[in-house]
Amino acid sequence: MDPSSDYHFLNQILWRRVKLTLVSGIFEGVLQHVDPNKIVVLKNVRNAESGRSVPGVKVFFGHEILNVELMDEAEGASGEKASAVSINTERAGMEKVKNEDVNVCEPASPAPEVPTSSLLSDLKYCPSEEEEVTYTVIDQFQQKFGAAMLHIKKQSVLSVAAEGANVCRHGKLCWLQVATNSRVYLFDIFLLGSRAFNNGLQMILEDKRILKVIHDCRWLSDCLSHQYGIMLNNVFDTQVADVLQFSMETGGFLPNCISTLQESLIRHLKVAPRYLFFLEERQKRIQENPEIWLTRPLPPSLLKILALETTYLLPLRLVLLDEVMSDLTTLVDGYLNTYREGSADRLAGTEPACMELPAELLQLQDFQKQRRERAVKEYRVNARGLLIRTPLHPKEPTACTAGKEERVQGFLFYKTDGGDQVPRFLCPKSHEDEKFLDKESKQTTAKSQIVPPRKEGEAHKDSKNKPGCWESAGPEDPRAQKAHALPPTWASQSQFSLKEEIEQLTVVGNKGALTSPKEGALVSPSLLQETWEAPTDTFHLPEKAEVSTLPPCPALEKTDSWISPSLNLF
């Protein structure tokens, strides 16, 4: 194959289907790229002799090609117009890939070169879809390893990830993924061994001029340090940046937990959960077989997971940087307009050397105060003073499990995996409340008829062993212990229907009993939570509650001594 004559001819038939006759066989595919250095790239490759398709893109070298034939298929012609604009992009992206027998996965429809963040934000993974990420597997030192090192050393920012069997000083590192703006390299450390680090990777990982973007660098840093003597340097950890961003957003509060990569991509990159299926698939595979990354050869589906896992880190870093630096941008904008849009008289009396903190920068105090006030309203605080983050993926509600939603007098109690309750108001209606109370009273009556009377000492023991769907106060809670030790007279009082008691009390109220001056007032969430944790199925309100349009119930007041009198409404 003479480059001087055939190069221009092949460029004229780009995106047409061709047949290449090689020394070792015959291959068919769509001509995607022709390099002056005798490199021909085909996609949708099929071995004409065996009939088997080759996944991704196949690279052929000029000294192997004996003949090139143009195949008359509409497939190539239809793709020519749509992809002609990407010829220069592909040529720049390959960057003279010498001596690389690259077996990679390429986007189905190449597009003009655009900023990496927007290009990567559209990535998605589904086993039934075509590959949408380019990656190169490096499992030998000949040809591919040297070219990869040359490309990586030219970068200023990289994303790095690792997979293996319990990646730490006691585990086994199997794969090291390194992604740039245009390439993703999958280094098979299981096959290459420590020579991979000695021949260039160690220099890159320790280089203080190259920024490495990693999500949770603790495990990889421990593994590299103790097994290979590598001190990881200049790292941007997206997990740490997520906590810093949360602290700034809430005025100084810290979250109760860190975020996984999937949560960070959903929260900051706004990636739809269905496009992050590959992370769920990864977790599923690891649970089924913790040593899945030791498999050789690794299935293409897992190789795609490795590539995608690393590719998303670069745009995630850019978004986190923008969010963390948002206050700086706002304050600088105010600084720019301080004198420019002010009166000229103000400048005459201003000393240039005045070092007093200007009002434009004092706004930062107001920002933090407002954020703290908003955070206290939006989040709940745990015992350590940390804000409890709302799960991004609540599990499907099941009976007697976390994630169950229950409506209680106009409130929606959402129970998280951690056992916390978040009350949310749902605009109560009187007829809905009446139906709810009627339903609860029927359940109470049915239970009281079936359950035989028990001794006083057995109440706490049985309630401890009885499974329940909602949270209990626990044996350490003195309120729960006292509630379980109620006298036996309570059982006889609970025999009455709650609806009948309310109707009787309504009649008494119409004759002169006091009613609440605040009709339609809302019940305090803390009060409802205390009432919800009662061991019985009947709701009670303390005497100070000014929320019900019904008069107080004398029969219920006698047994409300266990409710803390300090509970007040708004």
Curated annotation (Swiss-Prot):
GO BP annotation list: meiotic cell cycle; piRNA processing; regulatory ncRNA-mediated gene silencing
Gene3D superfamilies: Ribonuclease H-like superfamily/Ribonuclease H
Biased composition (Basic and acidic residues): 433-442, 453-465
KO phenotype (gene knockout): Mice are viable and display normal fertility but show defective biogenesis of antisense piRNAs and activation of transposons. Reduced sequences generated by Piwil2 slicing, impaired biogenesis of Piwil4 piRNAs and derepressed LINE1 retrotransposons.
SUPFAM superfamilies recorded: Ribonuclease H-like
Pfam families from the UniProt entry: DNA_pol_A_exo1 (PF01612)
Subcellular location: Cytoplasm
Any one GO CC term of the record: P granule
Keywords: Cytoplasm, Meiosis, RNA-binding, RNA-mediated gene silencing
Molecular function in Gene Ontology: protein homodimerization activity; RNA binding
Region (Disordered): 433-485
Superkingdom, natural source: Eukaryota
Domain 3'-5' exonuclease, first and last residues per copy: 135-307
UniProt record similarity statement: Belongs to the EXD1 family.
Oligomeric form and interacting partners: Homodimer. Component of the PET complex, at least composed of EXD1, PIWIL2, TDRD12 and piRNAs.
Notes on the domains: The 3'-5' exonuclease domain lacks the conserved Asp-Glu-Asp-Asp (DEDD) residues that coordinates divalent ions essential for exonuclease activity.
PANTHER family in the cross-refs: PIRNA BIOGENESIS PROTEIN EXD1
Role: RNA-binding component of the PET complex, a multiprotein complex required for the processing of piRNAs during spermatogenesis. The piRNA metabolic process mediates the repression of transposable elements during meiosis by forming complexes composed of piRNAs and Piwi proteins and governs the methylation and subsequent repression of transposable elements, preventing their mobilization, which is essential for the germline integrity. The PET complex is required during the secondary piRNAs metabolic process for the PIWIL2 slicing-triggered loading of PIWIL4 piRNAs.
Name of the protein in its database record: piRNA biogenesis protein EXD1
Species of the source: Mus musculus
Gene name as annotated: Exd1
